């Protein structure tokens, strides 16, 4: 099944639902960064959460950044997700592995840490980005993003995130975001019903691995509440905006002396993108051209 995002409403528009399948893009992140099992689960959950949050933005080009910094051995992670369905991300310590937690699951909370912060930045492409910071609740990502939605956006929300990774890589990943909109937030019975149904689920990946599609999941949760599934299906992908041109631009900012030193000592330069682990090689000729450009610009000014 292709990585995708679909939306739905229920309760006469009082409930907003978004579903994401992110199996392939999570596997690509795992392969690119050579992630451990627990690091794969952590980054996969965070990338899915980023896509779910970005789906609520309106302006073309809008993006959401999620940064989690905890006191666990994983260190932290950063995700950049767009309204256009693209996402990228990395973890600080990709090779960290931990024993399963008490429930026999990957210990994402132990890897990230239970103490720390979640930083969310929403960039709509103009003006100053909107940023918010909340303390971590569990380090499991889903709890922490739900806490952010409740405190910073004041929207009652239920969030399910899941990644199943084994010896063959990632075989299931995705998530569901259910939100009670302001016009229905005072309906305590509706909120209680939604919370009860979500709490009875065993998680997202068991649903996906059992063969259920996103519409199936929506039907299970909201089918008797006037469910309306929107027809649009958005395809999702891991995509990084890095390029050799950007690398050369960054090297140019180092200045003539540093570039000359690289030519003499290293016969060039190597740069690795943190977001996608793509490696770029700049030859001594490339660096010499940058020096020429700097000198030309200096004379022109």
From Swiss-Prot:
Pfam families: HSP33 (PF01430). CDD domains: Hsp33 (cd00498). SUPFAM superfamilies: Hsp33 domain (SSF64397), HSP33 redox switch-like (SSF118352). Keywords: Chaperone, Cytoplasm, Disulfide bond, Redox-active center, Zinc. The keyword DNA damage does not apply. GO terms for molecular function: protein folding chaperone; unfolded protein binding. It is found in: Cytoplasm. One of its GO terms (biological process) is protein refolding. The keyword Glycosyltransferase does not apply. Under oxidizing conditions two disulfide bonds are formed involving the reactive cysteines. Under reducing conditions zinc is bound to the reactive cysteines and the protein is inactive. GO terms for cellular component: cytoplasm. Disulfide bonds join 240-242, 273-276. InterPro entries: Heat_shock_Hsp33, Heat_shock_Hsp33_C, Heat_shock_Hsp33_N. Belongs to the HSP33 family. Redox regulated molecular chaperone. Protects both thermally unfolding and oxidatively damaged proteins from irreversible aggregation. Plays an important role in the bacterial defense system toward oxidative stress. NCBIfam families: PRK00114.1. PANTHER family: 33 KDA CHAPERONIN. This is 33 kDa chaperonin. It comes from Rippkaea orientalis (strain PCC 8801 / RF-1) (Cyanothece sp. (strain PCC 8801)).
